[in-house]
Amino acid sequence: MIRVGYMGIPFSNSAEMSERLAKAIGLEECEHVALMSAVGVVSALMDGSIDYGVLAVCNRFAGPVMETREALEGKPIESIRMEWTHIHHCVFLKHKDAKVTKLVSHIQALLQSKDNLHRLYPNAEFSECEDTAYAAEMLADGTLSDDCAAVCRRDAGEHYRLYLAHENVEDNKENMTQFSIIRRV
């Protein structure tokens, strides 16, 4: 079976785009493999453990995804198809009454929502993690303390049964990210 790796974990934007881009190039029957990072995707392509990879390339407002750019540098990889998708972020808490001192997410989500997050949580610090959905998972399983909030997709927070504090916190309602499906040349 054809394997398509993506950065992130289930309930991330990359997971959705992995399915969408695979279908767009005619891969109806394939296994989608969560690989957390762009480096993980590129390494798996290079060692042959996946056939295709899906990476976030650029955000309309936050700019290039540097993690992807650095992972691809000098590698014999080609892009097969690129697509833009709207990106929305929510703030989820462990409990309704949580006092937020730290906002945790992928750097791109924090950058795409920084003005609204500063307005909503003026004293909270930003803390980067590998993936938006991973922030929700870590908050739910207790890896993150109750004073943390996860900035992630709505379905990620709901999957982990977190409390939805704010929806659509991205600074620009036309927030979009370009994703690419790639393969080794």
What are the functions of these language-model segments?
Residues 1-185:
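Domain-level signature for soluble enzymes in the chorismate/prephenate branch of the shikimate pathway
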